[in-house]
Amino acid sequence: MALTLTDVTRIAHLARLEMADADAERTLTQLNEFFGLVEQMQAVDTTGIAPLAHPIEQILEVAQRLREDAVTEHVNRDDNQRPAPAVQDGLYLVPKVIE
């Protein structure tokens, strides 16, 4: 998958980003290099290889000490929404930004 300069300028326009031509060309190069890397990774046959949660453990003798994922405090929705300018039925109301 390769992007064109038109794609980059269109995406910038949709994201409401001002982008000079030189920046758009540099971004195009970087994005195409990134997509090339993704295509290389997708081409690798990983059949029969177990996914790794912590790949660093395979090359370094280090144990990742992770805390147990447990709820330590409860969230009170009303307290969190009190400072919001507009709330309805427990949801934050925001201005429409998509045309």
Swiss-Prot record:
Native organism: Burkholderia mallei (strain ATCC 23344)
Keyword vocabulary terms for this entry: ATP-binding, Ligase, Nucleotide-binding, Protein biosynthesis
Catalytic reactions of this protein: L-glutamyl-tRNA(Gln) + L-glutamine + ATP + H2O = L-glutaminyl-tRNA(Gln) + L-glutamate + ADP + phosphate + H(+); L-aspartyl-tRNA(Asn) + L-glutamine + ATP + H2O = L-asparaginyl-tRNA(Asn) + L-glutamate + ADP + phosphate + 2 H(+)
Protein name according to UniProt: Aspartyl/glutamyl-tRNA(Asn/Gln) amidotransferase subunit C
Function noted in UniProt: Allows the formation of correctly charged Asn-tRNA(Asn) or Gln-tRNA(Gln) through the transamidation of misacylated Asp-tRNA(Asn) or Glu-tRNA(Gln) in organisms which lack either or both of asparaginyl-tRNA or glutaminyl-tRNA synthetases. The reaction takes place in the presence of glutamine and ATP through an activated phospho-Asp-tRNA(Asn) or phospho-Glu-tRNA(Gln).
EC number: 6.3.5.-
GO BP field: glutaminyl-tRNAGln biosynthesis via transamidation; regulation of translational fidelity; translation
HAMAP family: GatC
Superkingdom of the organism of origin: Bacteria
Gene3D superfamilies: Glu-tRNAGln amidotransferase C subunit, N-terminal domain
Subunit structure: Heterotrimer of A, B and C subunits.
SUPFAM superfamilies linked to this entry: Glu-tRNAGln amidotransferase C subunit
Keyword Protein biosynthesis: yes
GO MF, one example: ATP binding
InterPro entries found in the cross-reference section: Asp/Glu-ADT_sf_sub_c (IPR036113), GatC (IPR003837)
Stated family: Belongs to the GatC family.
Disulfide-linked positions: none
